[in-house]
Amino acid sequence: MKVKIINKSNNPLPKYSTIGSSGMDLRAYTENDITLKPLERTLIPTGIYISIPEGYEIQIRPRSGLSIKHGITLINCVGTIDSDYRGEIKIPVVNLSNEEYTISTGDRICQMILQKYENIEFAEVEVLDETDRNDGGFGHTGY
């Protein structure tokens, strides 16, 4: 699928790392290094602007290696960029480690995944269909 992109950074365009990759890494684009203290959070600019096709969203997800090795992850776990957004993609990160971590231009900071979605049209009713589970919630299937 062809998707329009503006790259105002000096980083390469996002690309798939392997033939089976579902996500592309996004890279930081900053004038100066950004050092995050423990539990500090900030928005990391990418210099990337994307025209997302209608009926799709871009999901922003943490990079597993960055999370497990350095405690750097996304504030909202999975972020959504809507198809009508045209601003710069900025990544909300948090340092969950006990050590400072520095992010520099070109560092891979998250993954983006293009995802199709359907809009919901609610049909208001008085009763929902029954299932084997019904209203069994947290812990219902065991711990």
Curated annotation (Swiss-Prot):
Its cofactor is Mg(2+). Pathway: Pyrimidine metabolism; dUMP biosynthesis; dUMP from dCTP (dUTP route): step 2/2. CDD domains: trimeric_dUTPase. Pfam families: dUTPase. GO terms for molecular function: dUTP diphosphatase activity; magnesium ion binding. It comes from the Bacteria. Transmembrane segments: none annotated. The keyword Hydrolase applies. One of its GO terms (biological process) is dUTP catabolic process. Keywords: Hydrolase, Magnesium, Metal-binding, Nucleotide metabolism. It catalyses: dUTP + H2O = dUMP + diphosphate + H(+). The keyword Secreted does not apply. Substrate binds at residues 63-65, 76, 80-82, 90. Its EC number is 3.6.1.23. This enzyme is involved in nucleotide metabolism: it produces dUMP, the immediate precursor of thymidine nucleotides and it decreases the intracellular concentration of dUTP so that uracil cannot be incorporated into DNA. Belongs to the dUTPase family. This is Deoxyuridine 5'-triphosphate nucleotidohydrolase. It comes from Finegoldia magna (strain ATCC 29328 / DSM 20472 / WAL 2508) (Peptostreptococcus magnus).
